[in-house]
Swiss-Prot record:
Pfam name, any one: OSCP
Record-stated family: Belongs to the ATPase delta chain family.
Function: F(1)F(0) ATP synthase produces ATP from ADP in the presence of a proton or sodium gradient. F-type ATPases consist of two structural domains, F(1) containing the extramembraneous catalytic core and F(0) containing the membrane proton channel, linked together by a central stalk and a peripheral stalk. During catalysis, ATP synthesis in the catalytic domain of F(1) is coupled via a rotary mechanism of the central stalk subunits to proton translocation.
Name assigned to this protein: ATP synthase subunit delta
NCBIfam families: ATP_synt_delta, PRK05758.2-2
Bilayer topology: Peripheral membrane protein
Principal place of residence: membrane
Subunit structure: F-type ATPases have 2 components, F(1) - the catalytic core - and F(0) - the membrane proton channel. F(1) has five subunits: alpha(3), beta(3), gamma(1), delta(1), epsilon(1). F(0) has three main subunits: a(1), b(2) and c(10-14). The alpha and beta chains form an alternating ring which encloses part of the gamma chain. F(1) is attached to F(0) by a central stalk formed by the gamma and epsilon chains, while a peripheral stalk is formed by the delta and b chains.
Entry-linked Gene3D superfamilies: N-terminal domain of the delta subunit of the F1F0-ATP synthase
Keyword flag Oxidoreductase: no
InterPro entries per record: ATP_synth_OSCP/delta_N_sf, ATPase_OSCP/dsu
Amino acid sequence: MAELATIARPYAEALFRVAEGGDISAWSTLVQELAQVAQLPEVLSVASSPKVSRTQVAELLLAALKSPLASGAQAKNFVQMLVDNHRIALLPEIAEQFEALKNAREGAADVQIVSAFPLEGAQLAELVTSLERKFKRKLKPAVEVDSSLIGGVRVTVGDEVLDTSVRARLAGMQAALTA
């Protein structure tokens, strides 16, 4: 995984520099779409086929996109460069790094919230507000329900984890009692 991140970083940074000259959100949508298309087994099969030219592969990728940027010269050049350098499989990692650059620019971060029970709108808003104060940045929440937590929440922001779940507390008590 580390080598994928290392290889993908220059592509993500170059695309981000291009995006800074326009609409970063639109470019983010484009790269997310590309990442989804690039993960399809059929696309990977066609891309690796010696019977299909690199230009045809690039056209196939661009044709599968809904983003209006897909018809632009910069998007075409980016996709063609990835195809020519056999880097289509890197698109999910490129998209992830692009999103991280976008979040850094906006002073924001993605947050994964895992809760034992579904969170209502007001509960989620209150939780996100308190987490934004704690982490001192704007958070973009993705919520998941995991009943094995028993109660509470587990919050992941980047490489920081805040686990206030009942399961984590019980595990801590068990470790203290058996030590």
